[in-house]
Swiss-Prot record:
EC category: hydrolase
Cofactor or coenzyme needed: Mg(2+)
Documented EC number(s): 3.1.3.18
UniProt keyword list: Carbohydrate metabolism, Hydrolase, Magnesium, Metal-binding
Family: Belongs to the archaeal SPP-like hydrolase family.
Protein name listed in UniProt: Phosphoglycolate phosphatase
Amino acid sequence: MVLSDFDRTLSDEKDNFIIKQEVVEVVNKFSAKFLFFVVTGRERKYMDILAKGLFPTGWIIENGGIIILRDKEIKLVDEKWYKIRKNLAKILDKNGIKYSLGEVIIYVNSAIDYKDKLDKINEAKIEWNRSDAMIMPKNVSKGEAVKILKSILNFEGVTIAIGDSQNDISLFSVADIKVAVANALPEIKAISDIVLDKEDGIGVMRFLEKILNDGSYLEKLIGFRK
């Protein structure tokens, strides 16, 4: 099972995070043979625009808040969260902090200037993706969503996580093999088993192609777990 972040991992910031067609084709080919999940902090409305034509096995969106798997869709929050979120939105409004409401999370773009104010929030958890912040329930993360996904699938095989930023740390914590793209933050590279020599989607694409085309490389990856 491969679990890949999207922004600056499958997609390139220079392309406004629209995934390259060549990357789409390889991911779709890979997903026809192996389990492949996109695990992103992005909201659904943006993925519909940025990932056109991409057909992975499934999705984990909003930083672990929602799992989408074939005909199943699971929100990993209860109704209490929405009352908390409403109050948090009022606090952000009062402080003049612009935000986007997802189906679960509150997303604050370019939030680093508000870090001191955001750090005072006690009712929720803040996770960072470079300079952007995601406000979410304390029990929600990419890693927790992957645990639930594996339970749903009764999956006991090897898990490979690919990422670049702070909010991928929880994803890496539940993976057998941790892979950083070449443009990953230093702290992500430091905890990775493999650092790719290419950036963003091209790096992921080459990695997937190697698994598809080189049986000995796949065996080597499986050996990481032993």
